[in-house]
Every structure is written in structure tokens, then in C-alpha cells.
Amino acid sequence: MTSHVTAHDVGGNEDIGTDHVPWYKQPLPLCTQVMRFILLLLLTVMFLGVAILVANARMPDPEKVRPLPDLLLESIPKVALLENGTNVIIFLLNATTVVVGFKVFLLERHMNGLPRVTFLVGVPKIGSFLNRMAFGVLDSGRRPFPLKNVFPIMAIRFLTSYAVVMVFRAFVIMGTSYPATDNHCQNPQVIEHPVLNVILTLVTLGSGAIHCGDLMFSGHTMILSLAFILAWDYSPFLHPWAVRVWVSVLLPISYYCILASRSHYTDDILVAMYVMIATYKVIDHAETGAPWQMQLLIRWMPWPGANTIEKWTADEVVVVVQTPAEDSTDASAALPEH
């Protein structure tokens, strides 16, 4: 089955071209993508849980193999308690990303003329204040991306980027076994209940499971870098620079906490940061969601969601919007008259 798609270039007077789109390239509904990519991410976390079992079992004996020489670890004093600081910053960065996504969602509703979201507005004294804080609309006037469906597209980029790098990390930690850093893994625990450890990996995204030996590359850095780049990319909808400054302060502090607590080697952080951000950038912001190749991974699923877009007709017009500058003031210009 193919569909006939005509694309118009904004700013031009002629069609870009006409093409027949095979069924496997037709985009799934965005809501379907979000729900199914959540399931796919959970499957990748389970796969990582199995990989952690292998990495933990294959880790060199700390009594025989000392930690690798590391320039930064030799320069930074060890502070074991800073491992908790890493977790705090992970929470702060993730919370920032969620707030940015929610505020952009409210902005899209506002621009579409939909009624404002309210909750407990009738509570005396604090009701109106809480509603302004939680549901107030922020608009910097800048449009780094088209505003249409920006929240589900943002979620899809998070889920797909994280899942791809999660699978890659699983293979990497099984491939080469690094000696433990100077932390609690110098006295490693034996995983007596492998299935339970995999379940704990799934429920806590790895933090609550026994996981020594999974050094190259850092799982903490993955989520820190992904939350950072999402907030960096989408926050200009709300304010030109405030959120960017906030996350730019948090990220290097989190890396310092990882190194000072001896949770990872320097290279573990550098590789994870590069791989995560590069993968995210490859999975671009697109009106159709994830790349069609990634949608093939979830197209076979019978549930949740539908496999077809109700308004996807044979003669649907797809508008291609050009956004040459990240902070352009209008990323969704109107079509010129013919």
C-alpha cells in the first residue's frame, strides 16, 4: 500500500515534489509512538539488566587488579558521599526537563486558543497563586522548532535516544571488563538472585540493582546528558537563556560528583556524554516523530494505539517548514498564496 504525498516548500511557489510513500514509511500516530516506545525502552532496560549480570560476573578481581590510572581521578580528592549528589542533580535535571516540556505543552494549547488548564483555583489565598505557578503560560516569542505537537515529539526524542544508547551500552559493558574504581566495588557483592536483580534494574533503571563492572560507559552520564540537551533545545520557547544557564551549571557539577565519588573513570563520562548527545541530534525533531526505521521496531506491536493516522489521506498535503536559525521568531510561516 502506498500513499500519494504532495509537499509544498514554504516561501516558494512550486511543489518540491511528489512521491509514493510505502506502507512501512508511513508515520504512526504520535500518541502511538509515545506509548510503544515506552514499552521498547522498558525492554531495553531489561536487556541492560541481563548485561549487568554478565559485567558483574566478569569484572576483574579487585584484589588482583588495581584501578586504572586516571588523570582526573588522581587530581580530584575522593568524597564518597558525593555519589548522592549525583542522584540529586539527576532529579533536578529531569525535573527541569519535565517542567520545560509541560510548559511548552501549555504554550501550544494557548496558541491554539484552547482554554487554560486550572486546578483547585477556588482554594482561598493560595489557589490562584498555585495555578499561576503550575499552569501559567510562558512565551519568549522564540520558536526553535515548530510548535505543533512539540510535547509528544519531545517525548519521542527522549524515549528513542535513551533506548538506542541503552542497547549500545549493554553490548559495551559485556564486551570489555574494566577493573573497579576505588569505590564500594572494591568489595563486590555476589548476585545471588539474578532474576530479582534484573527486575530491580527495570524498576529503578539500574540504580537499585547490584551493578559493579558496568563502567564503560556511564549510565548516570547518559541520563544527565539527555536531560541537559532536551532542556537546552526546548527551553527557548519559554525564556531565551535562563534555563540554559541553570542546566549548564548543573551538568559539570554532576560530572564532578561522579568523579569525586569514584563511580566512574573519566573516559566513561566523556564517551557517554558524546554518544548520548550525538544520538539525540541524529534523531531530529520531526513532525512525523521518530525516523521511519525506528518506527519499524514498534509497528508490529498490536497494542497500544493504532497503526494509522485517521486524517492521513491519499492527497494529504505535507508542509515543509524551513527553520534556518535556532532562535527564529517565527518557525511556522503561513503558506504563500498561489
UniProtKB/Swiss-Prot annotation:
UniProt KW keywords: Kinase, Lipid metabolism, Membrane, Sphingolipid metabolism, Transferase, Transmembrane, Transmembrane helix
Principal subcellular localization: membrane
Gene Ontology cellular component list: ciliary pocket; endoplasmic reticulum membrane; endosome; Golgi apparatus; Golgi membrane; plasma membrane
Catalytic residues of the enzyme: H220, H264, D268
Biological process terms in GO annotation: ceramide biosynthetic process; ethanolamine biosynthetic process
Membrane topology, as annotated: Multi-pass membrane protein
Transmembrane segments: 37-57, 88-108, 117-137, 153-173, 190-210, 223-243
Side of membrane Cytoplasmic, spans: 1-36, 109-116, 174-189, 244-338
Pfam families for this protein: PAP2_C
GO molecular function: ceramide cholinephosphotransferase activity; kinase activity; sphingomyelin synthase activity
Broad enzyme group: transferase
Subcellular location: Membrane
Intervals, Extracellular compartment: 58-87, 138-152, 211-222
InterPro entries in UniProt: Sphingomyelin_synth-like, Sphingomyelin_synth-like_dom
Annotated EC: 2.7.8.-
Task performed by this protein: Bidirectional lipid inositolphosphotransferase capable of converting phosphatidylinositol (PI) and ceramide to inositol-phosphorylceramide (IPC) and diacylglycerol (DAG) and vice versa. Direction is dependent on the relative concentrations of DAG and ceramide as phosphoinositol acceptors. Essential for viability of the pathogenic bloodstream stage of this human protozoan parasite and, consequently, can be considered as potential drug target.
Membership in a protein family: Belongs to the sphingomyelin synthase family.
Protein's UniProt name: Phosphatidylinositol:ceramide inositolphosphotransferase
Species annotation: Leishmania major
Higher taxonomy: Eukaryota, Discoba, Euglenozoa, Kinetoplastea, Metakinetoplastina
Gene name in the database record: IPCS
